[in-house]
Amino acid sequence: MSFQCGIVGLPNVGKSTLFNALTESGIPAENYPFCTIEPHIGIVELPDVRLKDLARIYSPEKVTPATVEFIDIAGLVKGASKGEGLGNQFLGQIRQTSAILHVVRCFDDKNITHVDGSIDPVRDVETIETELLLADIMTLEKRKQKVEKLARSGDKEAKDSLYILDLLLEHCSDGKAARLLTIDEDYNEFKRSLHLLTEKPVLYIANTSEAETMEDDTGEHVRSLEEYALKENNIVISLCSSIEQEIALLKEEEKPIFLQEYGLSEPGLNKVIRTSFELLGLQNFFTCGEKEVKSWTISKGSTAPQAAGNIHSDFERGFIKADTFHYSELIKNGSEKALKELGLIRQEGKDYIVKDGDCIFFKFNV
């Protein structure tokens, strides 16, 4: 399973710098709007100490981490929903993503222009949210026109769809994101099928100054963003994208010293990647052996056969059982042999719900 996180925000807020840090690439990060026209795509490893621990125990020929795909989407501006600043193209790119990382400028720098002339994180967030909402309203109105004809003919499914469309239109017209509308479980599949921009989960990235990072002090700009995010139960991660880019370009042995200088326990990007994972309700299980130790990504709540299907469809189709133990038990006891002697390797069936950190050996027959 793979998923994409779209990095969005106004022009000149640090999106491309953040992307460079995430992917350790060197795309332009110039001080003018629309520096990024075509979206830049990067695949990033999920930071996971468990994989290193498993590799130490199994000494495999190959270690394969889980990955996250990030897309650097050009800066949105007011009027994007009407096509301003190549808005239609950029909104279409956001529609293809699984989650949104919204980069918000929370630093003052006279050398870097702001499209609105001043620093106001809440105003900036609302500018983007408004454009996404307007685009969603247009999507809903177009869909409603198509469904109304069928509903008038007595089609029950169309009537149900029309009911949900009206609920969403009223909700979005009130300036509320589609993800905040709770509806009956029976209608969630239809809601998801609309691919609304404001249905996507959002993580706010407060891009702060180097001074704020060194002082470990939350400034007024970050505090205002946190208060705004709290209203929607959203998360804010504070980091300085320019520092993160410097860290990303260092050799591994140099990173701890640099982090210590800034009083950081780890790169802020590690938290961004992990939180993006959690935002989408994803988790990992592992397959372990002498040839390969690999991390696999599944949705929380997945059954053992569904997890097996991520490896190969035959594994799901011919699933028999799953020999399972948890990563923590392996670390505690030191070896798979010790787990067997203690009776800690379980045989799970088709109804087993896979837990984050499970190590699984699937048995199947096709």
Enumerate the language-model features and the residues they cover.
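Conserved G1/Walker A P-loop phosphate-binding module
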Residues: M1-T113, V122, E141-K142, V147
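Switch/coupling subdomain of P-loop NTPase systems
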Residues: R95, A99-H102, F107-A135, T139-K142, ...
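Alpha-helical initiation/capping and key positions within long helical/coiled-coil segments
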Residues: T36, Q89, L132, T139, ...
